[in-house]
Structure formats: C-alpha cells, structure tokens
Amino acid sequence: MEKYILSIDQGTTSSRAILFNQKGEIAGVAQREFKQYFPQSGWVEHDANEIWTSVLAVMTEVINENDVRADQIAGIGITNQRETTVVWDKHTGRPIYHAIVWQSRQTQSICSELKQQGYEQTFRDKTGLLLDPYFAGTKVKWILDNVEGAREKAENGGLLFGTIDTWLVWKLSGKAAHITDYSNASRTLMFNIHDLEWDDELLELLTVPKNMLPEVKPSSEVYGKTIDYHFYGQEVPIAGVAGDQQAALFGQACFERGDVKNTYGTGGFMLMNTGDKAVKSESGLLTTIAYGIDGKVNYALEGSIFVSGSAIQWLRDGLRMINSAPQSESYATRVDSTEGVYVVPAFVGLGTPYWDSEARGAIFGLTRGTEKEHFIRATLESLCYQTRDVMEAMSKDSGIDVQSLRVDGGAVKNNFIMQFQADIVNTSVERPEIQETTALGAAYLAGLAVGFWESKDDIAKNWKLEEKFDPKMDEGEREKLYRGWKKAVEATQVFKTE
C-alpha cells in the first residue's frame, strides 16, 4: 500500500492540500479560496475560522478525489503565510478578533512610537528584522490594546497567540499542541534568533504576556497527532512546519551555505542559506531563521521585492495590453530590446535594498517609436533587475558569490524572463521539474520526522532540473543595461508625490 505525505499550504488568498509520494512527485491537489477583509484603508484581515474550514475542506477533497485512504497518510506538513497573527480564547477556541494579515499596515503608529523611543536597533539586533507593521509582534499588541477585555484576559492566562501554523496545529491536534517552529518564530519581532528564545525585553516593549506564546520547536519533529474526529478516525503525526519562503528554500534542496532560491510570486522573495551563522545585513536585507533540524538551526538572508508577478497582472488587468500572462512572453520576444525604455514598478514603494515606501511606479525612456512590445518587455525585465539588486546585496553581506539561482513561482514558466534573469545576474538559473516547492518543503520536513525520507541527501536526489538558463549576454551590454536601471530607480526616488 503506497504511503503519502499530506502538505497543507495555507496562503494569503487560498488554502491548498497536496499529496506527495516518496519521489517527491505530486499525487493530488485541492484548493479553496477564502474571503479577504479590508475594514479600513491599508488594513487587511482574514477570519481564522474561515481559514480553518478551508483547510478541512481541502484535506477532505484531496483524499476523496484521489482514492487515497486516511491510513495511507504517513505524516502532515504545514507551510503558511508568514507573520499573519491570530489571538484566540484558550477555553472556547474562538478568535477574539480577525487574523491580522502580514500585508496589513494598521500597526504603523505602534512601530513609529517604538522608533521614536529609540528601540529600532534593539529589535534589529535581537530579531534580524526591521521595526515594521509587516511582522507579528505589533499585531499582537494592537489586538490586546483594541479588543475590550483582551489585555486583562491575556494577563490571566486566558488567551493564546499564534501565527497560522500554530492555529492549524492547535486545531488539528484537538487543542493538544500549542507550538510553532523556529522559522515562524523568527518573524514575530519577539524571538531572539541568537538565543533561540522568546525575548523578555522585547515582550516588555510590546507589552505582550509571555504565557500566551507557543512553544518553539524544530521545523521537523512530531508535534502531536490529528485528533481522530478531524481525520477519518486516524491519528496522523503532524510532523513538519515552516513559513512559506523558508519551506520553498527547503523544497529547493538549498541545504548548503550559499545556496539561493528566488520565488517569483505576487512579490519576489530571495533567500540565501547562510548555514549556522546569522549574517548581519548592512544592505537592507532581513536576517532570519531558515529552519531548525537535526538539533541545529540554519540561518538565512532574505530580500523582498514588492512587485514581481503582479506587474504582469497589471499589464493584463490594469493596462489591458495582454489577455493572459503567458502572452507577455510572445510580445516581449518580438523586439530585440526595449530601445532604452525602463519600467520601475514601485506601485507600493520599493523593497530591498531601497526600503522606500513613498516611491511610486515610473516609466523612462519613451520615444515616438516606443511600441507596446517595448513596454511589455521593459516590464518583464524589471523583475530581473530587482532580483539583481537583491542578489548583489546578498553577496555583499555574506561574502559569498552566488553560483546558481534556483527559481520557483508563477513567472518561472516565462522563458524570456528566465533567460534575461540569467543574463543580467551573470549566473545560471535553474528551473526545477516540480515547482510546488513551498508545499514540497513542508512535506520534506514532515517526511524526515516520520522516516518517510531518511535524510537530506535522500531529498536532494529528488530535486530534478527541468531547464537550465545560462548567461549569454556580453559583459559590456549587461552593465550598460543595469546602469540604466539604477539611474531609473534613482530618478523614481527623486520624483515623489507631495
């Protein structure tokens, strides 16, 4: 009887359940979207119970639709949208407020106040993160400050906090396991990534009671078992947890120091495994925990690009220049170059290494001869220039020259982007056969804990190359194009709305 690992990929807009066999191949997928709530401008929230219901639905569907029995599931791995914050009643199990999503800016004033009080460097040194509404800590404080009776209840031990992984493990285990893993804990602004413990000073600054925090565990370990009534009467080990970008790093088998993966999703996320060293960034990168496994922790440098694949959606939905995302490739390849046109897609500001939240999108170099093809090509090229910006920052901070770039996410299907990426970073780009690397990473972590896979070497053998893109552009051309991009970014930052 064939066994499988069930991976739950709980994302920002949908929940997915994916079955993987021992070769790391997909044996079934189910997906369900859920509602986004926008109570005020810049606020983004989810209903944690809707997320839980969607997860139950996809787990049931993937098993039923693929003629798999529950006793064929060897273990469950969970990967999640990071930073999204849930606070719930320990006794009733009900969330006391909507889940505050990673994108939400409703805690900006808390961050500003802590910065004014001079604590930015304290947070940076201990957590590797920026003092920004993006991360979970200020979201917990906001809920405790704004929900009536919440703070008193928390101080009396009546509330629990968790990122989405914690919430799902708690629900699946029938309230038995209140845990998170190192990768998710490292995104909270409350966890000291050097001591590997919740930090009392940071908790005091955020006024968050320690008793509501989950226990922090390795990313690969049996945390508990499914309560029988949630899983067809079976008690299945819940055995792997990692935040989505760290899970993708693991799913890409980036196990060695200097290994890098880049995800081209709505935004772009590049992570470099820095081994057992937490590298302090001087270039606007985040220092974070990649995963904890085999009794030790691996660290990573992370760069964030705010607009990546969503630039292609903008061409389709906003400008109506294309009817479908794949069409962008055929338009881009009809011309040999952009004829000097640059698109800087700073629609919501610029991420790593600029961190300029006030910059807005801009286009440079238009002439009467500029056609739709040039414009589309320039938009696609912008994804690659931004990736080089991040990669250069990583090499500078780590002292490691990137030898190859493993890629995943929706935009990697576009061969033009992949080739231009290789050309502009002067590094080979490797596209894997299985591009569901986030879910695969969670499956691998769970599978290692239950003996489904023996070792990381076992997993590395599963990684198969679909296509490799080697750089073909000459050095002079590459540097001339990149100088133009840097000039365009500089001009974008000069031109800001009043």
From Swiss-Prot:
Listed pathway(s): Polyol metabolism; glycerol degradation via glycerol kinase pathway; sn-glycerol 3-phosphate from glycerol: step 1/1
Ways its activity is controlled: Activated by phosphorylation and inhibited by fructose 1,6-bisphosphate (FBP).
Q: Which residues bind sn-glycerol 3-phosphate?
A: 12, 82-83, 134, 244
GO MF terms, alphabetically ordered = ATP binding; glycerol kinase activity
Please tell me where ADP binds in this chain: 12, 16, 266, 309, 410, 414
Where does the chain bind ATP? 12-14, 266, 309, 313, 410
Its Gene Ontology cellular component terms are:
cytosol
EC number(s)? 2.7.1.30
Which of the residues bear the PTM Phosphohistidine? 230
Q: Which NCBIfam families match?
A: glycerol_kin (TIGR01311), PRK00047.1 (NF000756)
Function (record text): Key enzyme in the regulation of glycerol uptake and metabolism. Catalyzes the phosphorylation of glycerol to yield sn-glycerol 3-phosphate.
Protein name (Swiss-Prot/TrEMBL)? Glycerol kinase
Organism encoding this protein: Staphylococcus aureus (strain bovine RF122 / ET3-1)
Q: What gene makes this protein?
A: glpK
